[in-house]
């Protein structure tokens, strides 16, 4: 149970490739030492009851956070921070459930404070709307957003000073420092993250297929949106390449240069920033979803890419931008789970786009109705395999169950693709031609045979 087991297998696998998504980048940022990324990762494991991933999988010590949370919220039921239900997984021990809720609340408040520090330091991120603690009237239990008052579902914040709401307490600073040391010092996490760097990037092109995780930021008219990074504008392919460079700088750059510091901050921006190609939504409404009932405030308006990608001409424009050629060329996407329960189709733009995020995570099974997709590519074309939820290996053995899958033919060609038609085939042909030229040069005497004298 947990991603560390999968990463152990991948680290020993001879050939694999990954296009980084927002969750990958969050973990990469945490491993690099970005404290907001660390807080987010810890928040997720407490939210879903997966603390074993950090403690057992990566040797990260959560005891200081647990001790602090128990003391700080001893009289607080932390009702808003209960475990998010996951199909097939339950924690029945009430003491464990209470401790997880306390830890969840404690790290969430720390996260909001840390975010404010970066937002203030980087006005170019334009994320002032994510600083909300100073808008709370703690005595009345309300918050004022855009001139309108909303009741808070919880207003018990013993670590927040209303006069200086974003200041970390001394205990919180100590917890942040200890978590930082644990993440940066985890040998196993370092090994796994380095493999993700070695075998991954923001996008890849293979056999006339363009693969990227989430989005290519677009304007309302379908043109590529220019994103300014440190005074220079980037769009399309150049944007993804710049972003990839910044992620590597954040992790690998030595010293404490301004370039390194900016890259570290930008890695967090990629997780939740409005112009991030790994996110591309107006906001990440974490605070609102926890503390406010008004569903309008929960909305995370998607960027134009998510609506315009259904148009074939938009997909063609993006494929042209990345230099993808071929009669059968496609964009292969993930990020947004395909809600098959609502009749959503993973094949879009007349077959030009395939969205293969069906929600492998159990937390999404109830939302999507399935347990993910696998896209298979072979000499005849594409087929999409839709998986049904898998309960457990033990149940599969006892009841003779297996992973149930449904196969859908996406694209079938009457003429089989030969090895020579693939990227690898073209590479082999180029090598063969080079060898032929070398042989010809030897035959006509341009290359002399050397005699070895001993």
Language model segments and positions:
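Feature recognizes metal-dependent phosphohydrolase scaffolds
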Residues: 1-454
């Amino acid at each position: 149970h947990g991603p560390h087991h999968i990463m152990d297998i991948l680290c020993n696998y001879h050939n694999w490739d990954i296009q980084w998504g927002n969750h990958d980048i969050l973990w990469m940022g945490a491993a690099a030492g970005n404290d907001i990324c660390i807080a987010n990762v810890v928040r997720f494991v407490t939210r879903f009851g997966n603390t074993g991933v950090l403690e057992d999988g990566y040797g990260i010590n959560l005891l200081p956070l647990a001790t602090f949370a128990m003391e700080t919220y001893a009289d607080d039921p932390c009702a808003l921070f209960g475990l998010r239900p996951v199909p097939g997984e339950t924690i029945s021990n009430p003491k464990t459930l209470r401790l997880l809720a306390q830890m969840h609340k404690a790290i969430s408040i720390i996260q909001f404070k840390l975010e404010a520090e970066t937002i203030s330091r980087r006005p170019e991120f334009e994320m002032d709307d994510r600083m909300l603690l100073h808008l709370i009237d703690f005595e009345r239990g309300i918050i004022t957003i855009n001139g309108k008052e909303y009741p808070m579902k919880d207003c018990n914040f013993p670590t927040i000073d209303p006069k200086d709401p974003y200041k970390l307490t001394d205990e919180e600073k100590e917890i942040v420092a200890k978590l930082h040391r644990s993440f940066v010092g985890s040998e196993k996490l370092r090994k796994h993250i380095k493999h993700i760097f070695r075998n991954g990037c923001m996008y890849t092109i293979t056999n006339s297929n363009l693969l990227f995780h989430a989005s290519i930021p677009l304007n309302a008219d379908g043109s590529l949106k220019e994103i300014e990074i440190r005074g220079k504008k980037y769009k399309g392919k150049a944007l993804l390449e710049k972003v990839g460079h910044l992620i590597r700088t954040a992790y690998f750059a030595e010293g404490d240069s301004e370039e390194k510091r900016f890259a570290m901050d930008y890695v967090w921006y990629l997780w939740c920033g409005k112009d991030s190609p790994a996110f591309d939504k107006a906001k990440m409404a974490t605070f609102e979803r926890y503390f406010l009932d008004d569903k309008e405030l929960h909305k995370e308006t998607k960027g134009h890419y998510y609506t315009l990608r259904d148009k074939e001409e938009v997909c063609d424009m993006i494929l042209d931008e990345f230099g993808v050629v071929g009669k059968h060329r496609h964009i292969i996407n993930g990020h947004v789970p395909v809600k098959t329960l609502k009749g959503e189709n993973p094949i879009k733009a007349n077959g030009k786009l395939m969205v293969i995020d069906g929600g492998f995570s159990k937390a999404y099974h109830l939302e999507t109705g399935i347990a993910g997709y696998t896209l298979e590519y072979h000499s005849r074309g594409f087929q999409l395999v839709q998986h049904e939820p898998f309960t457990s290996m033990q149940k599969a053995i006892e009841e003779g169950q297996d992973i149930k899958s449904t196969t859908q033919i996406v694209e079938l060609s009457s003429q089989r693709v030969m090895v020579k038609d693939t990227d690898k085939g073209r590479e082999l042909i180029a090598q063969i031609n080079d060898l032929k030229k070398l042989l010809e040069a030897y035959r006509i005497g341009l290359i002399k045979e050397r005699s070895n004298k001993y």
